[in-house]
């Protein structure tokens, strides 16, 4: 059995103008919603930064929020936690990390309701350092997703790694960067993607693959990609006779998984799951120490200790001045709150 866990990241900056937001909604968010509603077997994990949720509600796009809320309500999607304003978490004070996480929970719970119950965490830009873990764990998240470049051990196909901070553990999933980027840059069609997954399985009875990318890839960055790629993949993976019941509880998949192991059969089917469902399907591996990184970090960047080159490049004087300015702003805001 091959389990495909797909994550889509929905975000627009607070400075985005309403006309551009409307275009993104019409080109991407609504067409994606229609695809998910058409293919009831589709399962995926989604991240909505709270600042985008606010803007959707403020700019008259409540139908999008309602649509994704309904999908979550019937177990087709799950939401993740994150920082509300898309902060680069390793580069901001720890108290601000906690505030951003809390603000995101408050905003998304307000608009998505009880359907917003994140078990996992998406750090913006997949920027990671060990010291962001504790506030994430304390927020109630069971897992975090990181870029594949952060994986310091053998690539996990049939085990799930974990990491820890101050004696508290959290599960770690790694994005398949190569596969995700090939999808994002139209280097694979639906048939090639499915063939790639089957090739990955090899002689293993059960494996999982995690892909993650910007939701705007579908329809906004690449016009019609939600139909020419995603819908075609879903079409191929539909269960023809007896579609799975709501698999949010993962029990059906777990039973099928166990049956395959018992009968010593090699599975050839691909099942779509949320990332959280993988927790019930695969054993835990060793405790690891992921590398500080982002989904834009290269191996050469890591060797140079330049872990976040798009935001804090060691040779970029503009970056240095921006962070100096931000530090001043944070201190001013803190003092203002103390005086209020």
Residue ranges with predicted function:
Residues 39-42, 74-75, 109-116, 139-144, ...:
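Secondary-structure transition/capping motifs at alpha-helix termini
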Residues 97-125, 196-212:
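CE4/NodB-like, metal-dependent polysaccharide N-deacetylase domain
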Residues 129-182:
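Surface-exposed loop and adjacent secondary-structure segments within mature catalytic domains
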Residues 29-36, 65-69, 98-108, 133, ...:
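Generic structural signal for well-ordered alpha-helices
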Residues 16-19, 55-60, 91-93, 128-137, ...:
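A short acidic (Asp/Glu
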């Amino acid at each position: 059995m091959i389990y495909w866990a797909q994550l889509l990241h929905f975000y627009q900056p607070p400075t985005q103008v309403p006309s551009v937001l409307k275009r993104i909604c019409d080109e991407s968010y609504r067409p994606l919603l229609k695809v998910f509603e058409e293919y009831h077997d589709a399962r995926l994990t989604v991240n909505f930064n709270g600042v985008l949720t606010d803007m959707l509600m403020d700019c008259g796009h409540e139908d999008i929020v309602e649509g994704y809320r309904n999908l979550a309500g019937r177990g087709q999607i799950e939401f993740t936690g994150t920082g509300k304003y898309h902060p680069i978490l390793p580069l901001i004070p720890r108290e601000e990390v906690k505030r951003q996480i809390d603000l995101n929970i408050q905003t998304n719970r307000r608009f998505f309701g009880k359907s917003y119950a994140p078990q996992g965490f998406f750090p913006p830009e997949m920027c990671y350092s060990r010291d962001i873990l504790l506030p994430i764990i304390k927020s109630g998240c069971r897992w975090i997703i990181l870029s594949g470049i952060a994986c310091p051990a053998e690539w996990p196909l049939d085990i799930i790694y974990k990491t820890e901070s101050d004696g508290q553990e959290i599960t770690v999933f790694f994005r398949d960067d190569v596969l995700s980027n090939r999808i994002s840059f139209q280097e694979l069609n639906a048939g090639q993607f499915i063939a790639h997954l089957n090739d990955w399985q090899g002689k293993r009875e059960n494996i999982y693959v995690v892909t993650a990318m910007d939701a705007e890839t579908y329809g906004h960055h690449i016009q019609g990609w939600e139909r020419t790629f995603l819908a075609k993949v879903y079409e191929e993976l539909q269960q023809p006779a007896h579609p799975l019941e709501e698999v949010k509880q993962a029990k059906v998949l777990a039973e099928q998984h166990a049956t395959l192991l018992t009968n010593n059969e090699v599975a050839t089917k691909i099942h779509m799951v949320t990332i959280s469902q993988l927790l019930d399907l695969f054993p835990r591996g060793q405790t690891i120490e992921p590398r500080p990184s982002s989904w834009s970090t290269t191996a050469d960047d890591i060797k140079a200790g330049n872990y976040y080159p798009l935001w804090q490049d060691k040779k970029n004087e503009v970056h240095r001045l921006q962070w100096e300015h931000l530090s001043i702003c944070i201190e001013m805001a803190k003092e203002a709150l103390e005086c209020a």
